[in-house]
Amino acid sequence: MISVDTYLQEVLAIAHPLAPLDMPLLDAHNATLSSDVYAGDRLVLRAGRRIRSTHIGLAASIGLDHLPTRPHPRVVVISAGEDLTEPGHTIDERHSYEANSWLLTTAVREAEAIGYRVHTIPDTTEELKDLIEDQLVRADLVVISSGPRSVAMMRESLSALGEMYEREVAMEPSGHHSYGLIGPDRTPVITLPSDSRGAYIAFELFVRPMIRQMLGRKSLTHRTLSATLVGEISGSKEVRSFHEAIISHENEVLRAQPVLANERGEANGLVVIDEQHSALSSGSEVSVILFDRQSE
């Protein structure tokens, strides 16, 4: 079993910044600046910044009509499983609605990448392998979440396409975690747990930093802050536990309120229970990961 931090470093090692290209000013808006920009000897724009309207105006004011940028990564999100049914159709007790690919594709877009969604119900390992292989032509990164009954098929398909590494990560919620390089261009791929809660938390902890590194961003992870816990939460010793929460300021104090399953859509962060504790009581000082996307 490896730690969350070790697993993050392993997946970051396969997510390299994309090759830079010059883009016209309007097209460069919201992209990442790939190199420093000078006006003569004076530095005016620093590499690694997200290009905003003020940067565009500054570039134009010094006579530039293009800026050096990193393109937005193309991320293909694949969901596979015979037990998964697309929303809008009737299901029985043997099936569940396919939600992960919708959740993950929109999370990819929130992370400033280009997201493509693919859902499939493969009959054979070869069929699934062919589908994944066909997607590589438009992918800088592949993210896969399969139904519980399709994990073995996904494992075999990916292993036939390249080098895959399976890891047991000391975290909860957890599930099947693996990553690798597949296809002729050694495209990075990462698999996420089948449970939607575990898949989303794993996305924020691992996939989002991969995307930001491919964008050339300096800051890869969400901010970690201290907050006062409102309510009680529990976890398991020797693993790091993550609980969705609403993080808010009240009387100049940062508070973290864990949410119930039906309130997950309101969560804007995670409360973290470290490996040395199995429970935290109300009023405890806790570490929180804040999903502060607007300021990034």
Feature-to-residue mapping (PLM):
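Helix-rich terminal scaffold detector
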Residues: 1-5, 69-192, 196-202
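Flexible glycine/proline-rich
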Residues: 2-5, 21, 25-26, 157-296
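Short, glycine/charged-enriched hinge/interface segments at domain edges or termini
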Residues: 2-17, 30-122, 255-258, 270, ...
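Alpha-helical scaffold segments in soluble metabolic enzymes
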Residues: 6, 10-13, 43-46, 58-61, ...
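Structured N-terminal alpha/beta-domain signature
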Residues: 28, 32-45, 78, 143-152, ...
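Generic structural signal for buried aliphatic residues
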Residues: 43-45, 51, 142, 280, ...
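Short, conserved clusters of charged catalytic residues that mark active-site
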Residues: 54, 127, 224, 228
